[in-house]
C-alpha cells in the first residue's frame, strides 16, 4: 500500500502552522460527525461515489484554471461547482475535499487514521493542520448558507448559453472551495484567504459577469426609451379626404404661399426692361416705315415711267392732216381702224388748220 507515501508527497510542500492548530482536533471531529450525519446536503442522490474518487492516484499538479479568471474559480466554490474533477489533474487540496465528501473515505482523515502514523515527525502536524482548516471552512460555510439558497448551480461556461434569471442551471455535484496552494507565512491567521460567499436567500446564482451586464443593460434601456419618447412624439397621419395620399401635408397650396422678396424685381431692372421693349417697338416701326417708303417710291417711279413713255410715244407719232373728206370715205375699214382722232388745236394754233386733222 503506497497511499501514505503519496499523501506525504502531496502534503510535502505545505508548511506546518503553529502548535495552536493542534487544539482544533476536537472541532474537526465535531465537523466530521456533522458532515457524516447529513452527506446528502452536498451531494445529489444520483451521483456515484466513483466520480468523487477519480483523483486518488493522480500526482501533484496545480489546479487547472481558465486563462481569463483564476480568482473566479476559487470564488465559485459554494455558488456553483465547476463540474466533475478530471482524473489525474486535480490538486491535492481538492482531492482531500473529495475524500471528505465521500462517506467511504471519511475515516482516513480522522486523527486516529493509520495513514498519518507512519511519519509522525513532520506529517502529523500537517495532517491535523489541513483537517483543521477544512473543518473550520465547512463550519463557516454551513453557518453562512441559508435554507432557501440553492446549492447546485453552474457558472456560465464559455460556449454554453447563460441561464435565465428564473432558471436554475443543472449541476452534477457540489464542490468545496478551492484552497490556495501557495504556502502561507507562519504568523498569518488561518482565515486569511477569501472564502467564497454564498448568495443571499431567495436568489438564484447565475454567472457573475453576465448578471452585471444584464443589470446594466436593463437600467440603461428604460432611460433610452424615455428619451426617444420625449424627443420623437408620434403623430398619426390620417387619410386625406380627397384620397390623394401621395401629397405631403407639410406643403401648402400655391394660392396660400407668399412671394418672397427675391421674387420681386427691382425698379432699375423694371426700367431697363421697359427701355428694351421700347427700343424693340421703335425698331419694328422703323422697319415698317422703311418698307412702306420703298413701296411708295416704287409706285411713284412706275407712274413716272408710264407718263414718260406716253409722252415719248406722242412725240414719236406721225401726224397727217387729211383735208379731203372723200379720201376718208374711200379708205378701207382696216385703214380706218388705225386712224385716231387727235385734238390738233395746238397745232392749228401754230398753223391755222384749214381742214380738220386726221391721223393716218
From Swiss-Prot:
Positions where Citrulline occurs in the chain: 342
UniProt keyword Phosphoprotein present: yes
Post-translational modification: Citrullinated by PADI4.
Bias-annotated ranges (Low complexity): 345-360
Phosphothreonine, modified sites: 65
Record's compositionally biased regions (Pro residues): 153-164
Annotated TM spans: none
Molecular function via GO: RNA binding
Compositionally biased residues, Basic residues: 1-12, 238-254
Pfam families assigned: Cgr1
Source organism superkingdom: Eukaryota
Keyword annotations: Chromosome, Citrullination, Coiled coil, Host-virus interaction, Nucleus, Phosphoprotein
Sequence positions bearing Phosphoserine: 18, 21, 24, 47, 50, 58, 66, 69, 80, 91, 102, 110, 113, 128, 188, 217-218
Coiled coil: 272-323
InterPro entries the record matches: CCDC86 (IPR026570), Cgr1-like (IPR005579)
Protein task: Required for proper chromosome segregation during mitosis and error-free mitotic progression.
Protein name: Coiled-coil domain-containing protein 86
Source organism per UniProt: Homo sapiens
